[in-house]
Amino acid sequence: MSNYHPHSHPHALSHPHPQQVHNQLQNPHQNQLPPPQRHNHAAPTAAASASGAPSSSASASASASILVAHPPQPLISNSLAIRQEIQRFESVHPSIYAIYELIDLLPMADAQIAQSIRDHVVCIEDSFVNSQEWTISRSVPDLRLGIVGSLNSGKSALVHRYLTGSYMQEESPEGGRFKKEVFIDGQSYLLLIRDEGGAPEMQFAGWVDAVIFVFSLENEGSFNTVYNYYTKMAHFRNGQEIPMILVGTQDAISERNPRVIDDTRARKLASDLKRCSYYETCATYGLNVERVFQDACQKILSQRLPLPPQVQPARPTTPQGNRLGLAPYQAPTNGQRGQQQLPLRMSADFAQAEQKLWSLQAASSSTINENNNITKYNPGAANSLQGDCSQVQLRDPRDLAPPPGKELPTPTSTPTTSRKSRRRSNLFIPSSSKKADKEKEPKSSELGSGRSIPIKQGYLYKRSSKSLNKEWKKKYVTLCDDGRLTYHPSLHDYMDDVHGKEIPLQYVTVKVPGQKPRGSKSIITNSALTSSLMANGQRAQNTLSDGIGCLTLAKDNQRKLSEKLSLLGAGSIAAGAGGEPLKSNSSQQTSGDEGIAMSNSNSQTFIAGEVANAGNKLEAQTPNVKKRHRRMKSSSVKANEADDNDGYEFYIVSLDSKQWHFEAANSEERDEWVAAVEQEIFKSLQSIESSKTKQATSTDLAAMLAIRQRVPGNGFCVDCGAPNPEWASLNLGVLMCIECSGVHRNLGSHISKVRSLGLDDWPSPHLSVMLAIGNSLANSVWESNTRQRVKPTSQASREDKERWVRSKYEAKEFLTPLGNGSSAHPSPSPGQQLIEAVIRADIKSIVSILANCPSEVTNANVSARDVRTPLLLACAIGNLAIAQLLIWNGANIKHTDHEGRTCLAYARAAQSLATAKSIKAAAAAQAGTTIPAPAPPTNGGIPAPQYNVEDTTALVELLEGLGCPEAAPLTASGTLPRRRDTLGTPYEKSVSGVI
């Protein structure tokens, strides 16, 4: 048994003898000692002094006596907690001795069992002795996270998924305690997770740094429990001090248990909890699980960030000797900055060091670069800070300043406080005109580098497109002159050209919430201007300026009224300006005294510019503008309140109903972005005007046609036989009807990744899988043994189709198991069979093996010495479809072979071979010669790799996008490394030969 000395604490009791423990077990009411009550109050702690601090004018002895005589409530609470912890700690040792006594009472026949129990108790004892409080370094930071929720909330599955990466359906009634290492901003932290089995108590509320409230989206009771638990926690601790996260779990949602808590109610609860984020998670396939805990850790660290000291007005005080001083310290409570007074006995040296520390922190925080919106250094502020801290300093702060005649050293790097406060000469003050010109220039920190400067750029908030967690995130948005709108997470990502996304502007329009489309806004015009317009059509056309569809009405060459039009209104403006107004489908009442009417093709379009007759000057334009705004906002909400409610948002809508929501800082910035985007949309439409009449013969349309017609079985739904399916499952490689696609979505994306043939994007890897498998091949695997069950038809009910689909893909009832061979000739392992199928490019065998085996089979090695995996072999032969299938089924893209080469290195080698082959074929075609056909395969019938430039290039891009590392560098070893030829190195033979 290990040496066990936990009772070195002054409150500790002596160790009881085993016989005493045995006697206590027999007579539990004897020899029971009361809890220790001895407490030394002669030197109160800082925390205790803070709670009951006397005034600064009181003497030190009087203050100490007051604290001892009447301990405040925080001191009582801390004392009680300390005594309870001591009792808990001391109760372990007698219990362990009691277990040893009971083990000794076991008969000799059970000696082996007794020894096994003794060994386990020793392990428990060692773990207790070496617990975190005695062993871990003080420099290791910890994060305390609490998880609360009802028994059927799904919190245990959420924690289990985060810790293990797997799904556990059973709920743990007693909760649990867990530890995990997390990395945040490159720093390692010890995360302590406390899964509370019941309602939060006082101890739990005082322990946590953050709380996650969990409820199930299909259980009303778990949702109401969150309210009760939050109310109970509020009795023990201020909710404003604790970061909170609300999580709704989707694990129990099914056809029988539909969702009952909609998104609106959940977000209402999150807003009621204050400072609370809301997520919807699914522990079954890991949706948002990592994100929830990462956000909780970030919130804890944000709560702990020290706030810079706030400068207070100088209050002169008389320094005293060794007394109970008042040291200002930061109290980051409720997100507000403020100073509190901490009673603390200070010596003169400590007071002087403390004063210097606060002065340096204030100076460093006030000299940050102005681009970070921190004010310049103010010497008066520093003096006031010194005055505020002078109540604990024993020397005049002027004694710390250098002599007046001594010149300060000139720094060579960033300007310091002293350098900024030095007097400058008036000889080289820049002129005001140059300074104004310099201010007009854009700051270099606000512009991207490395590329041409876009038309418009800046930070906007973008709403997440995920339906489960629609939140606003700050993005760096750029509007390019080639008809693209790009956005990146930050300016640095834009400068590095990483993590960016783009929106092509050829087939989109821009809208502002709460406003009608810009082409449908109208200002009703005087009908008398119609004849003038037709007579002066050319002159009216000349007034179109300033961007897309901007209409300018010049009055006395000074007053102008501009109305921006949408793209749909541009065509009608041109028609109207040509001299003939377009007829409206709806009648409009005109007042007969107004200026211009602008609308789209559904109403009259009149344009009144600088009309030739100057006598027709109109004075009543402004009232119509107000009328137009009243029509635009027909509700009782004021026009100036509409912008506030909309939040200065605008959104871009594409032809396939995709939307990108953005939000600007104010209405002016939003209007600038909308106008700039409209201008680029107009330019993009003009640039493709000549190509509109051409036939649509793009690669995507050809690929879609090939998927429908060339792949066997794709003319009908894979599960019910409905004709002309329009939906697909990517990882299964099949087409299905819209009703079966809904069933596939309910299975989860880990079983079936559903996409639309006509609405979604189809990158090359997805197309290659669809072209390689198809409905006929997939059904030959997934329906190879239907056990005489009748397949539903297209007229069958949805319930019948769902039962068939779940039995087919989820339960895998119709699969034929892999053959084991005979005892004399056993079949290879599934991993070796998969390697064999990859080398032969046998798609059917690959689909069958992946369907029958767990994901670990995708990382099998060729042999003990040849550690190549199926993914490495697929990349070596440049097979894009097989590589994508393996990646979807859990293949490790970071695995390296025995020489440190990754799958990306193999893919690049295949790309080089494909490029060389293509160049050779092009040269032969230009020379008029023919390339001899390759010799038939001689190595067991293995087909020669057919390297294709498009497929290998797409494979390289796929691996790069997934973050696959480059080839690992060679490490020093005791033997010479093998030659690093790309594919010419003689590898060990696999089951079927050598690649």
Swiss-Prot record:
Segments crossing the lipid bilayer: none
Domain of life: Eukaryota
GO BP terms, alphabetized: medium-term memory
Keyword ATP-binding on entry: no
Arf-GAP domain span: 679-822
Pfam families: ArfGap, Ras
ANK repeat windows: 866-898
UniProt xrefs under PROSITE patterns: ANK_REP_REGION (PS50297), ANK_REPEAT (PS50088), ARFGAP (PS50115), GLD (PS52057), PH_DOMAIN (PS50003)
Domain PH, first and last residues per copy: 453-682
Molecular function terms from GO: GTP binding; GTPase activator activity; GTPase activity; zinc ion binding
Keyword set, alphabetical order: ANK repeat, GTP-binding, GTPase activation, Metal-binding, Nucleotide-binding, Zinc, Zinc-finger
Classification via Gene3D superfamilies: Ankyrin repeat-containing domain, Arf GTPase activating protein, P-loop containing nucleotide triphosphate hydrolases, Pleckstrin-homology domain (PH domain)/Phosphotyrosine-binding domain (PTB)
Region (Disordered): 1-56, 308-340, 394-451, 576-599, 617-640, 970-995
Residue ranges of every copy of the GLD domain listed in the record: 138-322
Residues the entry annotates as binding GTP: 149-156, 193-197, 249-252
Function: GTPase-activating protein for the ADP ribosylation factor family.
Family as reported in the entry's similarity comment: Belongs to the centaurin gamma-like family.
Protein name: Centaurin-gamma-1A
